[in-house]
Amino acid sequence: MEVLYSLSKTLKDARDKIVEGTLYSNVSDLIQQFNQMIVTMNGNDFQTGGIGNLPIRNWTFDFGLLGTTLLNLDANYVETARTTIEYFIDFIDNVCMDEMARESQRNGVAPQSEALRKLAGIKFKRINFNNSSEYIENWNLQNRRQRTGFVFHKPNIFPYSASFTLNRSQPMHDNLMGTMWLNAGSEIQVAGFDYSCALNAPANIQQFEHIVQLRRALTTATITLLPDAERFSFPRVINSADGATTWFFNPIILRPNNVEVEFLLNGQIINTYQARFGTIIARNFDTIRLSFQLMRPPNMTPAVNALFPQAQPFQHHATVGLTLRIESAVCESVLADANETLLANVTAVRQEYAIPVGPVFPPGMNWTELITNYSPSREDNLQRVFTVASIRSMLIK
């Protein structure tokens, strides 16, 4: 994997900097590194593809070295270099696609394709290593079964979940109380509602709670907490739990009271915030517990009083909500991230070449299913294919 990254980094630099008119002295170190790559690769044969519709391709390396010049690089020099660069880039692209198409239930973090396994051989250790990539650093650690640490912005840590629970339900669904939520990606939105606006609740207060367990622990997370859940702020028709009927939800938004968010790790509270909104920090957690209250306003103008009558029918439904959004966090496991294209790159290659469903990844690389059942085997394979995708993205956009 380190060789693949070093090849890609060298090729990217060569493509960007070996251009007509450039002073040789400005790129002499790069050209020496480029020539070392050619010397190491010459005389070797590789084969890629042969899975799904990914065609089998054979690769032979027999290229001349780039020479020295006293002045600027001329058109002939650059054209010779370009021919070599384009062949190497095509090779790297196919090695990456071959690797992204494969999976293994055992030691899935190790190279799976024939070409990448060959590149891991001792003879290729002479290629100048560049391990500056976060994915390469963490792949090396994971390969040695040591602690990794990926920095994610908008981590796709929450499997998609959208549902509701009813704490009070009447047969005609005209006097309900409960919670509804939408968890997806890096965001939780939860709303507590009471058609009667806590009319008969103790002290006219309804208590709500929403608990979310993460599939992997996060550390040093920067989080935004808001006293609102905009996705539940407009009327809607909702299917009943048994599917036998539907019920109408017509929210009137109130501000939540006594808001508390707890971040827990292995059942122990690590951080707690009360009535604090905006940016908050969570040190280490695998569970989030949100609790909040709906309080019937003790004093109401006639207009507000008309919204929340003392008896049925309740045409407007008191609602309070919270939004919790993870802006950035560190995770020991690789995840999809809204700010990265790695999952999209891997999925696109597997779809384009009709890669058959294997023993590890779900059909279509369904992220919700993958993260819901995030096994060690999936973690290993995902770390490998995301590392390869990050390498490929240097050369192929």
From Swiss-Prot:
Q: Where is the signal peptide?
A: none
- Pfam families the record matches: Rota_Capsid_VP6
Concerning PTM, the database record says: The N-terminus is blocked.
Q: Which domain of life is it from?
A: Viruses
> Which of UniProt's keywords are assigned here?
Calcium, Capsid protein, Intermediate capsid protein, Metal-binding, Ubl conjugation, Virion, Zinc
Where along the chain is Zn(2+) bound? Answer: H153
Q: Locate the residues binding Ca(2+).
A: N266, D286
Please give the Gene3D superfamilies that the UniProt record associates with this protein.
Answer: 2.60.120.170, Viral capsid alpha domain (1.10.1350.10)
Q: Which residues lie within the region annotated Interaction with the inner capsid protein VP2?
A: 62-73
GO biological process terms held by the UniProt record: fusion of virus membrane with host plasma membrane
List the GO molecular function terms.
host cell surface receptor binding; metal ion binding; structural molecule activity
The protein's matches in SUPFAM superfamilies, at most eight in alphabetical order, are given as: A virus capsid protein alpha-helical domain, Viral protein domain
Where in or outside the cell is it found? Virion
A cellular component term from Gene Ontology for this protein is: viral envelope
Q: Mainly resides where?
A: virion
Biological role: Intermediate capsid protein that self assembles to form an icosahedral capsid with a T=13 symmetry, which consists of 230 trimers of VP6, with channels at each of its five-fold vertices. This capsid constitutes the middle concentric layer of the viral mature particle. The innermost VP2 capsid and the intermediate VP6 capsid remain intact following cell entry to protect the dsRNA from degradation and to prevent unfavorable antiviral responses in the host cell during all the replication cycle of the virus.
Tell me its family.
Belongs to the rotavirus VP6 family.
Subunit info? Homotrimer. Interacts with the inner capsid protein VP2. Interacts with the outer capsid glycoprotein VP7. Interacts with the outer capsid protein VP5*.
Instruction: Give the note.
Output: The VP6 trimer contains a zinc ion located at the center of the molecule. The zinc ion is not essential for either trimerization or transcription activity of the DLP. Zinc-depleted VP6 has an increased sensitivity to proteases.
Protein name according to UniProt: Intermediate capsid protein VP6
Q: Which organism is it from?
A: Rotavirus A (strain RVA/Human/United Kingdom/ST3/1975/G4P2A[6])
